[in-house]
Amino acid sequence: MATDKELKKIKRHEFKENFAKFYPVEVIKKMGFDRYICKKCGRGFWSTKKREFCGEPTCGDGYTFIGKKIMREIGYKESYDLLVKTFKKWGYKPLKRYPVVSRWYEGHNFVEAGINDFQPFVVSGQVPPPAPAVLEDQFCLRFNDIENVGLTGRHYTGFIMMGQHVFNTPEKYVYFKDEGVQQLVEYFVKTLKLPKDDLILHEDVWVGGGNFGPCIEFFSHGMELGNQVYIQYEQTPEGYRELQTRVIDMGTGAERLVWFSSGEIMSYDVVFPEVMKYLYKQTKIKKNKEVWKKFAQYSAIIDAEEEDVNKAFKEIATKIGIDAVELRREILPTAALYSIADHTRALLVAVHDGELPSNVGGGYNLRNILRRCFSLIDMYQFNIDLNEVIRLHIKEFGRWYKDLKEETVIFDVIKIEKERYLETVSKTKQIIEKMASSGELSNVETLLKLYESNGITPELIKQLRPEIELSSKFYSKLEDLKRPAQKHEGGINVSGIQKTILGFREESNKMSFKAKVIAQIENFLVLDKTYFYPKMGGQDWDLGKIEDIPLKSVQMQDGVVLHELSKSKKFELGQDVSCEIDKERRKQLTITHSAVHIVGAATRKVLGTHINQAGSEKTIDKGKIDITHYKALTFEEFQQIEKVANQMVKKGIEAESKIIPRGEAEKKYGMRIYQGGAVPGKDIRIIAFGNDVQACGGTHVENTKDIKFIKLISSERVKDGVVRIELMVGDKALEKAQENEKILKQVADLWNVSYKEVPKTAERFFEEWKDQRKKVKELTEGLARELIDTKLKTENIAHIKLPVSDFSMLIKIADEAAKEHKEKAILLVGENFAYGISNHSEIDIKKELHKICEKVEGDEKKARGFQLKK
């Protein structure tokens, strides 16, 4: 299939040639607009007054609204309140925002546009919309244009997309192109008092999330105020097809609207007034308003995705008659403050919604922008406390997103990430010094490798070597690399086979049943209905028998359950078969699965609401749950989680299981029900243990008392931002506890002490061992020096074998001895390695090592060898 960029190029030409077919031409004409073709870019556009150019900043004179009051001046949140008030008369329903972490949308880490809230299920028609016509104030994250943030006024990593969405289904038409464009023009012209003569409508194409359609962009004075997309088509491997649900997807950035209405030089001062006041005060930066006003007008041409920012700077400098170096000196420190304001707010919302900085998934982007903040602070030597910046965001932005006022975890996250950043800085200097002279650092591929391997940002390089010109396309390239790959299904071809009815979802206690054979692929049997649980959601498959033939596995492929027989037997299509499920295995898997839910709930109670599930496994031996957390668990936290989990078990919480429409589940319980990731289907199964509610298709106990006992057996930080907890349940948990007690008893008996005295006794033995080890080391070093001194009295090389297993100790002995024997050679041999150093003009120590070692590295003066020859 074509990429988004390729498809957009193809469709842009097609839609322009057939504009009357794809755009609401007649309605636009009735509103007084006429069509023109831009003499510079060639696009079609509509205006109430005759124009030669389309109003794009690159086709005109940049942003011409700065310093002017073009329309009614509005506040940040007021922009959305007025949208709701205007669209209320047409029956639009305002929605509560979705989390910016898009766990419901496979292949996406974050919400990048408001329409993502309804993809893939609503837009594809699989699931009904929350209402036929809705509005939203959705926080979005985008990381492909980080270099532009702080420079253009329109670029943010985190921003509010005010959305107008209409869902036309085959059963019900609501509004589409004609009504949609009229409604938005009324919002701009009547509500916001934007003169109609100042409004320009662009014809364009929108592509995203596998969907596309014509769109109309609303421009005024060089600024795109909104984009109304008419999603009609879905891309397929064969081309494209018309969607069953046709959608209006309009997005307008709240940040852009409030900036445009104010006429201020930069949007960030209007969006973050309290944060910027603090940043200016702490850094004592006073921007030159005359220079900034001129720069801001032409900053519209800056776009790191399309061209080099360095080149754009030179172009702007020429336009406004200022030396490019002087312009950068004036602009960049303030732009750094704007970036810090933007990045910290984006981080705040993302962490609050359940993502953490890390080296994996969406966490990669969060670490990226946080480290950029650290680097900018260091580069310009700013006196900025990021915790105070976050507190101001919570106060300021919390007036709109009130749930942010409860956020506390982010302060811990910043502290830990700062420590990791400082470790990176200490390693960076040496690496950069080696590469600076070669010119490699101007290459974007080199920058990407440095960041991925060592966590080194371009800002950190610039801080250490200001004279080096760096590529401005680093962050856009990094975002391309880190986009999640689409999954491709493999396995057995089940096309044409009807999906299996999953009986266990409603009758999980049924252990024997009859079913019809509807297909057989080698040893894999497909039934019309099954109560065997296939491997999915981290839970192992059931075992048992079909017609007395033991099962080897049970798997599901594209909704079809495949029962793998342990031996070959041919069945007739339509044949009735008797099935028996292994009760004991199912019971153990069931209590393990429920225990994993309970432990997940306990981690949220103990560690905080930032915890999300990042994976799980449920077997008959033990369970595993991976949680999103920014550091390894302390022993006290580990024990507290176990305690809280067992309190829930003891409490006897009844499990609530029901299958309900997806929209109803999301509305009632929120988007955190997707702890196990995206769940397909119009209806989803909800499992609730008290306040812990998840969309889950697994088997579960009826009451937490059925679990009996949960024993946490280990926790480890398996990757950045993810902690794995292993657990055992029921009788197996008791067996594990007894095994641990047996080991403790054996140790106590061995030392002839009580259980309570074991820790102190172990500590005493450890201290004695350390003391003995130190004495042995001192004796070995002393003996080695005597042997070397004695040998070198009569010979030019001291070749000595020592009982040493520590390579660094061997090197230390040889190097210190060589300082005293300046015309001699020393070759020391340890357990399976050797080290030599030569101050003798005729002794090649590397050759000497080759005589006794299989592998040697170094030169004739100093070398080390490995794998002693036998």
Where are each of the predicted segments found?
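N-terminal alpha-helical interaction blocks
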Residues: 2-12
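Cysteine-rich micro-motifs
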Residues: 48-62
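A glycine- and charged-residue-rich anion-binding loop/surface
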Residues: 10-25, 29-35, 42, 58-870
